[in-house]
From Swiss-Prot:
It is found in: Cytoplasm. This is Elongation factor G. Signal peptide: none annotated. Keywords: Cytoplasm, Elongation factor, GTP-binding, Nucleotide-binding, Protein biosynthesis. Its main location: cytoplasm. Catalyzes the GTP-dependent ribosomal translocation step during translation elongation. During this step, the ribosome changes from the pre-translocational (PRE) to the post-translocational (POST) state as the newly formed A-site-bound peptidyl-tRNA and P-site-bound deacylated tRNA move to the P and E sites, respectively. Catalyzes the coordinated movement of the two tRNA molecules, the mRNA and conformational changes in the ribosome. One of its GO terms (cellular component) is cytoplasm. Belongs to the GTP-binding elongation factor family. EF-G/EF-2 subfamily. It comes from the Bacteria. One of its GO terms (molecular function) is GTP binding.
Amino acid sequence: HYQEVPRQIQEKLIKGQ
């Protein structure tokens, strides 16, 4: 359930990979 997570965190996770 990552709908409440902002896109900044998702982008950081994607760029963190």
